Curated annotation (Swiss-Prot):
Name assigned to this protein: Ribosomal protein uS12 methylthiotransferase RimO
InterPro entries: Elp3/MiaA/NifB-like_rSAM, Methylthiotransferase, Methylthiotransferase_CS, Methylthiotransferase_N, Methylthiotransferase_N_sf, NA-bd_OB-fold, Ribosomal_uS12_MeSTrfase_RimO, rSAM
Recorded GO CC terms: cytosol
Residues that bind [4Fe-4S] cluster 1: 16, 52, 86
Domain Radical SAM core: 147-377
Cofactor(s) essential for the protein: [4Fe-4S] cluster
Swiss-Prot/TrEMBL GO biological process terms: tRNA modification
PROSITE patterns in UniProt: MTTASE_N (PS51449), MTTASE_RADICAL (PS01278), RADICAL_SAM (PS51918), TRAM (PS50926)
Organism for this UniProt entry: Geotalea uraniireducens (strain Rf4) (Geobacter uraniireducens)
Enzyme class label: transferase
Length: 448
């Protein structure tokens, strides 16, 4: 920077935890270059919006956020508005025309250059855009400013995706699947634990693919074993495990290793074989049912989370009924449902028999109502049991109630546990007796 006065930068990260790690890398670079990071956009000289464009709703949220923050250039101190991530990587030409309020666009391959790019903008009035090949792979030697609470962190073990589902734009935005070297992951994990992290959440587009592209026999199981040996680390959580990549050895490791949360996030998307085939998914209904039975048989009490898509092209009433019955029978602990989003450039966008938006919404509501009943019954079954809970703070309604998450609840996406009695500090992992429940949350007392 040319001035000794520190400029303040604020970053808003949208979308998934993988995006959050990218945002933390950019903040790390900026802090290293003597920018001051603030969480208050009103105080910021530079505002960065790290975007998602996976589905229609994500794109709309990104655009709405950009336009809202663009107003800060008129009524606050902001001098630069920067848009980064998947949205400019995918729509750079359109964004330049439609968003003159934005000063710089940066795609998914140029995060490490963020400070350099800002410097290049000095004295220039025209918009700048940097959207090269999406080949960036995070390295533990890169600066990263952790924005999550001190006791929990995400560890991105790979970038990109090579699964090529027919509805998905991720391979074009993030490139092919590429794993980070094992030694580099372990170095970063040690640094996180040294800073007080108790929970590490492993993330990638598909964590089961880890190591298959590396020489030397690296594997997800090997990584987990190395992480479990770290003193001070208490929870290891596995997010985004494709069903066809879940091996018997991984199941046994989840069962036998105390530090691995008895929790697994498996994006199934559907269960009807004709729909799965059109989605270009590799698992069949029979294989999915067999996997779930094996997981529950080998790991009693495991919490299973999945995501499902309704309204995929060609999804018939019978296909949806099969999906609805599957959710009723399987009783997932957590469930995310998405209406199919017709994304240009994907094979499914050109498929015949597109489902109307009205039908998509009806199916979405039916599936969510069904899951609410499943979740309520499941949570009621936990009353009078004991759970380990990570204390995260106070209830939004009253500071008389602590709140936290059990080992079977992931950050941000799952429910919470509210603590009605007992003392604990933020970041403590304590034993709770569950005394009550709602559709998605639990209530309990700390066991003395």
């Amino acid at each position: 920077m040319s001035t000794s006065i520190k400029e303040k930068v604020s970053l808003v990260s949208l979308g998934c935890p993988k995006n959050l790690v990218d945002a933390e890398v950019m903040l790390g670079y900026l802090a290293k270059e003597k920018y001051e990071v603030t969480t208050d956009e009103r105080e910021a000289d530079i505002i960065i919006v790290n975007t998602c464009s996976f589905i229609k709703e994500a794109k709309q949220e990104s655009i709405d956020t950009i336009l809202d923050l663009a107003d800060r250039k008129h009524d606050a101190r902001c001098r630069l508005l920067i848009v980064t991530g998947c949205l400019p990587q995918r729509y750079q030409e359109e964004l330049v025309k439609e968003l003159p309020e934005v000063d710089i666009f940066v795609g998914t391959g140029d995060y490490p250059r963020i400070a350099e790019i800002i410097a290049e903008k000095e004295g220039m009035s025209e918009q700048l855009r940097y959207t090269g090949d999406p080949n960036f792979l995070y390295d533990e030697d890169l600066p990263r400013l952790q924005s999550s609470p001190y006791y929990t962190a995400y560890l991105k073990i790979a970038e990109g995706c090579s699964n090529c589902c027919s509805y998905c734009v991720i391979p074009s935005l993030r490139g092919a699947f590429r794993s980070r070297p094992l030694d580099k992951l372990l170095k970063e994990a040690r640094e996180l634990v040294a800073r007080g992290v108790k929970e590490i959440n492993l993330i990638a587009q598909d964590i089961t693919g880890y190591g298959k592209d590396l020489a030397g026999g690296a594997s997800l199981e090997g990584l987990i074993k190395e992480l479990a040996a770290l003193d001070g680390l208490q929870w290891i959580r596995l997010l985004y495990a494709y069903p066809d990549g879940i091996s018997d050895s991984l199941i046994q490791l989840i069962r036998d290793e105390d530090k691995v949360c008895k929790y697994l996030d498996i994006p199934l998307q559907h269960v009807s074989d004709p729909v799965l085939k059109r989605m270009n998914r590799r698992s069949s209904e029979a294989e999915i049912r067999s996997l779930i039975a094996k997981l529950r048989g080998e790991i009693p009490g495991i919490a299973l989370r999945t995501s499902l898509i309704v309204g995929f092209p060609g999804e018939t009433d019978e296909d949806f009924k099969k999906l609805l019955h599957f959710v009723e029978e399987t009783r997932f602990d957590r469930l995310g449902v998405f209406c199919y989003s017709r994304e240009e450039g994907t094979p499914s966008a050109e498929m015949p028999d597109q489902v109307s938006e009205r039908v998509k919404r009806e199916r979405y509501k039916k599936l969510m109502r069904t899951q609410a009943r499943v979740s309520f019954k499941h949570n009621r079954s936990l009353v009078d049991t004991e759970e380990l809970v990570l204390i995260e703070g106070y209830s939004e309604e009253t500071e008389l109630l602590l709140k936290g998450r059990s080992s079977k609840q992931a950050p941000d996406i799952d429910g919470q546990v509210y603590v009605t009695s007992g003392n604990a500090q933020i970041g403590d992992i304590v034993k709770l007796r569950i005394t009550d429940s709602s559709d998605y949350d639990l209530i309990g007392e700390i066991v003395p």
